A protein has these predicted regions:
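An interfacial alpha-helical scaffold signature
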Residues: 1-242
């Protein structure tokens, strides 16, 4: 039997004080292809799974159904999400994955209990970045021109990194997260998009959201979009994969 995996939770969070030995149906929760969700016990944990029959590539609908299961579990307890598309071909493969990663799972549960993830997207469109965002094409042959272009490319990369770092520090001061994960990339409009994930206490979500207006005032010329709370995808120890 193949299992599609959604997330890992502490066994007691879905089964109370009962120590299950076999997969237990989770009432009112459906997964990909509207399949019944089961809590598959493995030591201190339960893996939220559904029976999996390959029918081709998993599309957008499956992605939304995967996210729905993780979000519903997140409302009740701490979750360690699996990457979308994670499938275990056998019961033993599933149990082995949990057994081999048990230490990392325990560390993540302790770290993330009572925590949530918030997202901020900062779109920078001001003219000061236009030159820094232009990509430098390297000549096909090695020589003085190649080295000159290579240096120019490195300078522009540092300019982008410096701008992103300065903004992330400013945003950190406004929102005071426990941890943050930052990445930036060029967008087609010629600007730069900085994607920031913040780890915060779940009880402080409203306080965090209330600081949004402050952020927009302190970041003129920058479009700021907030979303969350989400399960803490960016802050899990190690990777959850088959």
């Amino acid at each position: 039997m193949a299992w599609y995996a959604y997330c890992i939770v502490e066994q007691q969070s879905v089964q109370g004080g009962i120590r299950a030995r076999r997969p237990v149906p989770v009432e009112g929760l459906k997964g990909i292809a509207d399949a019944q969700i089961f809590a598959y016990p493995s030591g201190d944990f339960s893996v939220l799974v559904s029976e999996y029959i390959p029918t081709g590539d998993l599309g957008q609908k499956a992605l939304l159904q995967h996210a729905h299961v993780v979000s519903e579990c997140f409302k009740r307890t701490t979750v360690l999400p699996f990457r979308f598309g994670t499938v275990f071909d056998t019961d033993e493969a599933l149990r082995r994955a949990v057994r081999l990663n048990r230490k990392g799972f325990l560390e993540s549960v302790i770290k993330l209990k009572g925590k949530a993830e918030m997202h901020l997207k900062l779109l920078i469109k001001d003219g000061s970045l236009r030159e820094a965002m232009e990509e430098i094409e390297l000549p096909a042959t090695v020589g003085s021109e190649y080295l000159s272009k290579l240096r120019e490319k490195a300078v522009r990369q540092r300019e982008r990194q410096t701008k992103a770092r300065a903004l992330s520090v400013q945003v950190h001061k406004i929102f005071s997260p426990l941890e943050q994960d930052v990445c930036c990339r060029k967008v087609n409009s010629g600007g730069m998009l900085i994607d920031i994930a913040h780890l915060i206490d779940h009880k402080k979500v409203e306080k965090y959201q209330n600081r949004f207006q402050m952020a927009t005032r302190h970041l003129p010329g920058i479009e700021v979009v907030m979303s969350g709370p989400w399960p803490p995808y960016h802050f899990i120890t190690g990777k959850r994969s088959s």
